[in-house]
A protein has these predicted regions:
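Pre-Walker A adenine-sensing motif
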Residues: 15-32
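Conserved P-loop
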Residues: 33-102
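Short acidic, S/G/P-rich loop/turn micro-motifs used as interaction or catalytic elements
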Residues: 45, 72-73, 101-102, 121-126, ...
Length: 203
């Protein structure tokens, strides 16, 4: 049995974090580099645009694999890559389209990707138990899980449970991403598209 940690143990522990600056820090502070982030929102509110911007920022710190189960490599994906200038981070960003067993095999390899974006949770057909197994097998990875929404809530009971478990919960609405999780900066929101946010009354 492992010994219990004291308050001093926890206070003296060093954590690996993303040293966000500017509007990223204002929205999400400096979150840990491992764990689970959960992003959800309704179609047409800027969710895909936010994920692209987030990936571009995270590519400063590590390599990312986007498991694009929903869109694959369709023209819409290519258009978004062009729109957000993702060619500049191409050495750190890769697209795959793999079910969860295949993704696990990839992540077990030496020097596998440390950041994995799963788009979308509904397309994985994972149960909450499946999700816990994935998270526990790879505690040194960061999983960013994208979810459909039903109203203001994640679509499906399993997705809702994952949202509650996630370290960083990001709700996207009216071209603004709101931090609802354990990491919040001074504003707790990130404006994805200024004009869109103004037109939607989100800014």
């Amino acid at each position: 049995m492992k010994r219990a940690l004291s308050v001093k143990d926890i206070l003296s522990k060093k954590y690996e974090v993303f040293p966000f600056e500017g509007k990223w820090k204002e929205a999400f502070d400096t979150p840990e580099r491992t764990g689970v982030w959960f992003i959800w929102g309704n179609s047409g509110n800027g969710k895909t645009s936010f994920v692209m911007q987030l990936c571009k920022e995270l590519c400063k710190y590590d390599r990312i694999a986007i498991d694009s189960l929903e869109e694959g490599t369709r023209l819409t994906v290519q258009n978004n890559l062009k729109r957000f200038g993702m060619a500049g981070v191409s050495r750190h960003l890769a697209f795959i389209k793999e079910d969860i067993p295949a993704l696990k095999e990839r992540l077990r390899r030496h020097k596998s990707y440390n950041i994995v974006v799963i788009d979308s949770f509904q397309y994985t057909r994972m149960t909450y138990s499946d999700y816990i197994q994935l998270k526990e097998e790879f505690p040194d990875k960061l999983f960013i899980i994208i979810s459909h929404a039903r109203g203001k809530h994640p679509k499906g009971d399993a997705a809702t449970s994952v949202m509650y478990d996630a370290d960083l919960k990001i709700w996207v609405e009216g071209y603004v991403a709101y931090s609802k999780g354990r990491y919040r900066g001074s504003t707790s929101k990130y404006v994805i598209w200024e004009l869109g946010a103004l037109e939607n009354g989100s800014k």
